[in-house]
Amino acid sequence: MRIGLVCSGGDCAGMNPATKKFVEYSLELGYEPYFIREGLEGLIEGKIEPATLKEVSGILHKGGTILQSSRSKRFFDPAFRLQAYQNLQRHSIEALVTLGGDGSFRAMEVLAKEHSLLYAGIPATIDNDIRASDYALGVDSALNVILESTDRLRDTAESFRRAFVVEVMGRDCGYLALASAIACGAEVCIIPEMGYSLQSLGARLKEELGTGKRRYVLAIVSEGAKASSEVVSWLKEEVGIETRITILGHVQRGGSPSVYDRLMGFRFMQKALDSLSLGKSGVVVLREGRVEFLSSQEASSAPASLPLDMVRLASRLMF
């Protein structure tokens, strides 16, 4: 069987370790691995080629993806999906592994249903917003970037008796903000899934700053909460502390993958290929420490939620 690998949507650390495992394990199973370059746009344009061990040698430490990625509006046009499938047919590719997020998985599901194609989706997004999975590739590496940045900002905040508002990525999911706020010892955490009370937070912070218990404030705000400017104004005008804002942006996606992301890349890919070899299509997920393979329907119907124990840990940072 010939199997293709495509990276779709936003890049993240962990994609390259998964890519290396794709080639090595496919060959071990007796399959022929193929690379699709430049994401779904590359699939439409026919940028498909045989994958070799030489290409994946020495890529474990590299961030992003050696295959390159893209976002493709054209893929939602049936005519372009047919073109993509015909490109797969030219290479006799019977199955696809997709590294990406929910949008990429939905696109693959449509293509698979239209043309009886096997596919396996592997969560790869720093947003960690795949409903059925506790984890997506890139999250741990992104958190390490955030932690390094907040540790540095804390140094300068304490030196000048300032507040820093740090906006982190995550779209509509507050996992990155929640986890990093707990881990870096932030005083404020604002995420889209939870309400917050600046009034009660302000009373506590003013008391601590006024009595000398605290010299600085670190606030972590998820981009999806759309509250960074509000928090900056509140800290300046209500709490009464000089405030700066830092938007970390795409730096969170880059850099060498962490040990955990490398291991999860291997585990996710092995499960994906094992499932395809059994004729199954669906999505690889991590649930309660176990790597599982779910049908697309099971994966999409799972409720969206943050870990309750983490929410409890951070409750003092919101109210």
UniProtKB/Swiss-Prot annotation:
Name of the molecule in the record: ATP-dependent 6-phosphofructokinase
Binding site for ADP: R154, G185, A186, E187
Residues annotated as catalytic: D127 (proton acceptor)
Keyword list, A-Z: Allosteric enzyme, ATP-binding, Cytoplasm, Glycolysis, Kinase, Magnesium, Metal-binding, Nucleotide-binding, Transferase
Annotated binding of substrate, by residue: T125, I126, D127, R162, M169, G170, R171, E223, R244, H250, V251, Q252, R253
Principal subcellular localization: cytoplasm
Organism: Wolinella succinogenes (strain ATCC 29543 / DSM 1740 / CCUG 13145 / JCM 31913 / LMG 7466 / NCTC 11488 / FDC 602W) (Vibrio succinogenes)
Cellular localisation: Cytoplasm
Domain of life: Bacteria
Gene Ontology biological-process entries: canonical glycolysis; fructose 1,6-bisphosphate metabolic process; fructose 6-phosphate metabolic process
